[in-house]
Amino acid sequence: MELVSFGVEKLWDRLSQEYDQFKGVEDQVTELKSNLNLLKSFLKDADAKKHISEMVRHCVEEIKDIVYDTEDIIETFILKEKVEMKRGIMKRIKRFASTIMDRRELASDIGGISKRISKVIQDMQSFGVQQIITDGSRSSHPLQERQREMRHTFSRDSENDFVGMEANVKKLVGYLVEKDDYQIVSLTGMGGLGKTTLARQVFNHDVVKDRFDGFAWVSVSQEFTRISVWQTILQNLTSKERKDEIQNMKEADLHDDLFRLLESSKTLIVLDDIWKEEDWDLIKPIFPPKKGWKVLLTSRTESIAMRGDTTYISFKPKCLSIPDSWTLFQSIAMPRKDTSEFKVDEEMENMGKKMIKHCGGLSLAVKVLGGLLAAKYTLHDWKRLSENIGSHIVERTSGNNSSIDHVLSVSFEELPNYLKHCFLYLAHFPEDHEIDVEKLHYYWAAEGISERRRYDGETIRDTGDSYIEELVRRNMVISERDVMTSRFETCRLHDMMREICLFKAKEENFLQIVSNHSPTSNPQTLGASRRFVLHNPTTLHVERYKNNPKLRSLVVVYDDIGNRRWMLSGSIFTRVKLLRVLDLVQAKFKGGKLPSDIGKLIHLRYLSLKDAKVSHLPSSLRNLVLLIYLDIRTDFTDIFVPNVFMGMRELRYLELPRFMHEKTKLELSNLEKLEALENFSTKSSSLEDLRGMVRLRTLVIILSEGTSLQTLSASVCGLRHLENFKIMENAGVNRMGEERMVLDFTYLKKLTLSIEMPRLPKIQHLPSHLTVLDLSYCCLEEDPMPILEKLLELKDLSLDYLSFSGRKMVCSAGGFPQLRKLALDEQEEWEEWIVEEGSMSRLHTLSIWSSTLKELPDGLRFIYSLKNLIMGKSWMERLSERGEEFYKVQNIPFIKFSS
């Protein structure tokens, strides 16, 4: 099922599900469903064949318009019906005549749609379009193909990325560590060669880690600003506490800070993906002459060179050889060679070797091709794909990279249809943008992309993660699951894959991108697009292009550090009434008031006002009953939130402001489908409202004066599916006496406690599968380690500011068997830490920010897994080679001192 037939299928499902709503127009709806079924039979492989014939393309575009228009007609009618059902009997009687008119109008609209479908089918028959489409239809049964895909396990061994690179890594490490004459190493070559992968291997190499004191990695991109690059470097090289300060620094101050820092430290800075020599000229003033710093930069352009500079060397890695390409291809495409399900014969091997020649030795293209064939189990499938790649290359041979581009392009054509929509959505984001995966999942859900494949009990995030995993396995998206939470947190696109994504999105008229760097767009083109994304917007951008009544999605994306605002006129809400997705990050409105006309956007599924300059929310928000995602975390600290949520029964994600007006009172008991609720305040809402939210996976609670921990425990004990739980309390809350909490949630993986509590709960009252724990402001009177070290799956522990008020902590032998990361922040009374031999046997990273701790524990010598130690600068002398405590840390490869 291809892109356009996917839309038809969704529409057919909707008509079937809501059939009871269409009393009085059943005949018209039945006829429409029949026409849609007929249309589906003509659409097999239409998208795959539309490049062959302009007539096919025209028909596909017309069908898209029909599907969108029909969805709008049907949904508008259903929403009106639901509103009427909520009215009193007298009001419904008064509107009886109007209801009859609504049904007549619906019958007329459906009749018009049916005529348009008949016209398209007639055109397809008259001009032979049907034959063009069906000539290339696939022989594989869709269900069987999907079952094979579901059974298949893809290889994602990190060593796959390393095939053929061993010599390159060794040489680059030598340049950085052994060759002091070279301060700048340039890694150049075409896109997809594996430059970033190679740079990452070098950046994380143990020998390199041992050589330098500080490290910074910056993705430069085509549309960078000098200040953003300098800010990122300084943030990498200094403490996390300076992040906000650095964001607000002037360019001259950034320059001076970096210049001084690089004069006095051994630092490695990677500048990934510099496009022009002029870009390097902008960045380089921060580097003092001939000091301990080194730069590794990657670029597609070999002219990124230091003219006459003897401290510079260029390195161009070779493309993969045919044998190395074949080795890499086999590891991905044939991980289970010659199983009962998958037999690789000589003919298939020959086809595979022939196809990898089209990859030109580029590791990205080889991996994508391997991902394509990994899900193909028959000789027929391999032949079809081989011919498809060949035909694409014959059709377009201009340009050096045409073969590679089309290997990547075919990877898109071979995606299951639901993944095509998911992949195209990634075109929303700027180059090198770290995409928030959770938000992406809700974009998909709001547009109905993930509706048809969600299984019982599965959350929107579960479904979305499965999509990301499939795209990662096909080497089309770069991401990995967080080892602590098992979730995908961010993802991004390789440059070449992003070019394919943008090309396909433009070809499909999937969305329109407007930014300060893009050419001026034609308003007529924008008027035909149903998705509109603004990169770093200005008021002019929106005002110029807001008159598009068919707009489905309006998304704002910021790709750099800044605190800019852009003005949005309230009149836009009266002109784009079909919006499903509205993301207004950092917007501002006249007088700080969100216009009440937003309540007219009754089709909205996704609304974000994150960091918007809004002090007042209108009560008309209650009309947005289809919302599944709502973020009203605005940039005001005393915002009044109206009580508008009881009708929003479809909400899955709700983020409230951290600080609300004291008169705010919210009823949330109807939100039984919520999967994430953030900033729930016991001052503004009742804990009783939580009892019915049994689907919650994420919950952030703010406790007010008078709320006991026992009451809280009783209210949330039924939320058995919680994975991420955070408890905070308002400043000034005074807890008298000892209070006990029970937090025994079976699936809880991440727990954050920022509340005063003299003692931890007993071990049997803590989640047994907890992997991440963050404590702050707890003022624990007893050493927490004897309890926490018994959490057998704990991997990440942070004892942040004032979490412990005692003097001594002890980590005993055998404790913390899975702990990988430990952070110990400032504790005002903490003086002594004992680590027994055999404790924390898997610890990898240790951070200590304490001015009161008298000495490091001797037991650190026996933690052989410890690779990274981060300390305050006050420890530098004691831990230097001649320092009194050096023997405790001498086996740790990387030690960093930060202010």
Curated annotation (Swiss-Prot):
GO molecular function terms attached to this record: ADP binding; ATP binding
Keyword ATP-binding: yes
Keyword ATP-binding: yes
Protein's organism: Arabidopsis thaliana (Mouse-ear cress)
GO BP terms: defense response; response to other organism
Protein name, per record: Probable disease resistance protein RXW24L
Matching Gene3D superfamilies: 1.20.5.4130, Helical domain of apoptotic protease-activating factors (1.10.8.430), P-loop containing nucleotide triphosphate hydrolases (3.40.50.300), Ribonuclease Inhibitor (3.80.10.10), Winged helix-like DNA-binding domain superfamily/Winged helix DNA-binding domain (1.10.10.10)
Coiled coil: 13-50
Positions with a binding annotation for ATP: G189, M190, G191, G192, L193, G194, K195, T196
Record note on domains: The LRR repeats probably act as specificity determinant of pathogen recognition.
Gene expressing this chain: RXW24L
Keyword set, alphabetical order: ATP-binding, Coiled coil, Nucleotide-binding, Plant defense, Repeat
PANTHER family for the chain: DISEASE RESISTANCE PROTEIN RP (PTHR23155), DISEASE RESISTANCE RPP8-LIKE PROTEIN 3-RELATED (PTHR23155:SF1185)
Role of this protein: Potential disease resistance protein.
Xref: CDD domains: RX-CC_like
Family, as annotated: Belongs to the disease resistance NB-LRR family.
Domain NB-ARC: 143-455
